[in-house]
Amino acid sequence: MVKSLAVERAGSSAIRDLLEITEQPEIVSLAGGLPNPATLPTDAIARAAAAALEDDPLGALQYGPTEGYRPLRRWVAGRHGLAADPHGEEHVLVTSGSQQALELLTRALVDPGGLVALADPAYVGALQALRAAGVDLAAIPADGDGLCVDALADRLATGERPALVYVVANFDNPSGSTLSAERRVALAALADRYGFWIVDDDPYGDLRWHGEAPVPLRELTDRTITLGSASKVLAPGLRVGWAVAPVEVRRAMTTLKQSADLHTSALTQQIVHRTLAEPGFLEGHLVTLRTTYQAQAEHLVGALRTKLGDRMTVPEPDGGMFVWAELLDTTADSAQLLDPAVAAGVAFVPGAAFGVERLHPTRMRLSYATADAASLDLAVDRLAGVIPAP
């Protein structure tokens, strides 16, 4: 058997494994956080690709700088409050998805055996990347207001010293929670006091339809590295993400990216930039995304509460892509329900997939992003036939 220690540490993603199952046409998937196919801006992407190949074929098809396509870096810098900085793009590294950004910054800032703190439950991809890097994980409790910063402070007071604290501050994956304004201020103060880096993984921040967004962590402390992506607001198949970081951190990540893949696809970088920078495109497209996902979220939550309200609690999302449902039967194990659910034609992700130290057996992550209303109804009907009645 060919298997390194890194492979053993990382393990296989439960969600990626489920995607093989959900490709079967008879399965209604509430598992993956995939954009709704109807929202993919194929015409705009086609225009951008054609323009890149016509206007700059050499730049689109030749090797490029590891840091990324400079116009895209400038655009990202502007979106992150650096528009007035003439060298704002120096803070930006374009990566092959934000997943690569997390992998690079972990290797750049944490040696194997170092400590990274994160919420429990946590995003599966982050768990894979961190475990593959050989770091130790400090599991911090979380609730409806995000990471429990007081619990982190207690750990720090005992002498624990994480190099990184990883958060999905806006519409966490899997819980859907948003880190409250008060906790953001407290977390930033802890970073300044103890010297750790905050990694704010932010693929969902633009998908808000209710309420005001709290102040970004990057505006509260310079010890913030923000990860972003074109996957949720444009198309995941383009595999373009980015990190916005202090220049010395960006340079360290660039050195590691050189040995990883030289640079992210020059063509897809141009496609992303030309599409997102097209006047009026992003504003209009975000309206479409928010309207679509709000309607689908409300539909799924309503169906679950109507048909399964005696068996689970279902929060109302303000944005993002996920519902973190909780089974009322405290002895239930959602992992044991997955196979019967798939056999019935519906897929979800059990809470155990997101566990750092806890298994979250009564939790289920349900995505409303991909399926239409009729499919969501069918999925709920099938779940109702699998989850035991009280």
Question: Over which residues does each language-model region extend?
Answer:
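N-terminal small-domain helix-loop-helix segment of the aminotransferase-like
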Residues: 8-97, 104, 278, 347, ...
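Conserved PLP cofactor-binding pocket of PLP-dependent enzymes
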Residues: 27, 203, 342-365
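Conserved core of the PLP fold type I
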Residues: 59-194, 205-223, 293, 322
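Active-site PLP attachment segment
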Residues: 206, 219-252, 264-267
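Structural signature of PLP-dependent enzymes
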Residues: 253-258, 278-302, 330
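Conserved glycine-rich beta-strand-loop-beta hairpin in the small C-terminal domain of fold type I
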Residues: 291-301, 313-326
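Short, conserved charged micro-motifs
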Residues: 331-337, 374-378
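PLP-dependent enzyme catalytic core of the Aspartate aminotransferase-like
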Residues: 343, 358-390
